[in-house]
C-alpha cells in the first residue's frame, strides 16, 4: 500500500487519469476519417457554390442599379437643358402604362402592409 494514497477514506491507485483509450480497429478509424473528409469537402463545395450564386446575383443587381442611375442622370441632364423627358411627364400625370419603371406598384404593396398594421 505504499504506492496508493488514501483520500477521503478511499484508496486511490496511481496511474493515468481520465478516459482510457478504447481499442479501436485502425482500419475502421481510418475509414471514418476518410468519410469525414469526404463530407467536409462536399460541404465546402456546396458552400462555395452558394457564395458564387450570391455574388453573381449581387453583381446583376449592381448592374441594374447602375443602368437605373444612368437613366436618372440622363433625365437630370435633359432637365438642365430645359427639356422634360416623357417618362417624367408620365410620372407627373399619373399615367403608369407609358412608363417602363414606376414606383407606384411598390407603394401600393407597402400601403397594404402599413394600413393593416394600424400605424
UniProtKB/Swiss-Prot annotation:
Bias-annotated ranges (Basic residues): 10-21
Chain intervals for the UniProt region annotation (Leucine-zipper): 62-69
InterPro entries, per the entry: bZIP, bZIP_sf, CREBL2/REPTOR-BP
Keywords: Activator, Differentiation, DNA-binding, Nucleus, Transcription, Transcription regulation
Subcellular localization, as worded in the UniProt entry: Nucleus
Pfam families cross-referenced by the UniProt entry: bZIP_2
SUPFAM superfamilies assigned to the protein according to its UniProt record, in alphabetical order: Leucine zipper domain
Primary localisation category: nucleus
Functional description taken from the UniProt entry: Probable regulator of creb1 transcriptional activity which is involved in adipose cells differentiation. May also play a regulatory role in the cell cycle.
Protein name: cAMP-responsive element-binding protein-like 2
Originating species: Danio rerio (Zebrafish)
Gene that this polypeptide is encoded by: crebl2
